[in-house]
C-alpha cells in the first residue's frame, strides 16, 4: 500500500527534568533538565504512526518553515509544566499540480491550521484522492467533508463546527 500524507508538520521536543528548588529572583520553580527527546510532530507523527503499523511506502508533503513545540515535562510524574511554541504559522506553499494522486492508494490530510493548506487545497485533495482521510483543526461545515472517505475530529473541533451552524 502506498500512502501520501499532506499537512502541517513540526518538531516536537520533550525536555524531561525536575524542579527541586525555587528561583531566588522570582517565586517560580527552577527546572533542571535531565533528558531531551525529539520527534517529528503533526503530519510527521502521522507518518511515524503509519510506519509503526507496517506501512513502508509513505510519502509526505509538508511545510518548509520549521515549527517547533518544546514541552517541559516533570520526569517523575510525566506532568507537562510548560509548552513553548516557535514559528506557529507557515506560508501556504502547497502545490497540488505536481502530485500524481492516482499513484497513491490513500491520502491522509493532517491539517493543524498552521497555514500550509487552504480550504481550497483540502477540497481539491478530497476530490482527487481514491481513498482519503482528513484530520483538520479548521472550523468547517458538513459540506467540506463530502469528498473524504474518513473524517477524524476531536470534540473541541466538532463543537466549533456545530457552533458555526454546521448541519450534521
Language model: regions and residue ranges:
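Ribokinase/PfkB-type carbohydrate-kinase core domain
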Residues: 1-20, 34-168
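Divalent-cation-assisted or electrostatically stabilized phosphate/pyrophosphate-binding catalytic cores
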Residues: 27-34
Amino acid at each position: 500500500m502506498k500512502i501520501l500524507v499532506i499537512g502541517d508538520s513540526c518538531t516536537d521536543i520533550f525536555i524531561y527534568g525536575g524542579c527541586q528548588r525555587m528561583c531566588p529572583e522570582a517565586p517560580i520553580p527552577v527546572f533542571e533538565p535531565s533528558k531531551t527527546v525529539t520527534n517529528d510532530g503533526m503530519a510527521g507523527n502521522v507518518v511515524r504512526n503509519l510506519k509503526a503499523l507496517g506501512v513502508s511506502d509513505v510519502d509526505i508533503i509538508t511545510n518548509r518553515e520549521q515549527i517547533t513545540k518544546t514541552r517541559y515535562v516533570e520526569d517523575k510524574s510525566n506532568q507537562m509544566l510548560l509548552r513553548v511554541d516557535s514559528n506557529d504559522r507557515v506560508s501556504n506553499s502547497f502545490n497540488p499540480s505536481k502530485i500524481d494522486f492516482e499513484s497513491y492508494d490513500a491520502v491522509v490530510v493532517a491539517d493543524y491550521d498552521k497555514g500550509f493548506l487552504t480550504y481550497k487545497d483540502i477540497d481539491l485533495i478530497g476530490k482527487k484522492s481514491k481513498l482519503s482521510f482528513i484530520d483538520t483543526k479548521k472550523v468547517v461545515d458538513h459540506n467540506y467533508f463530502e469528498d473524504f472517505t474518513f473524517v477524524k475530529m476531536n470534540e473541541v473541533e466538532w463543537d466549533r463546527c456545530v457552533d458555526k451552524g454546521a448541519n450534521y
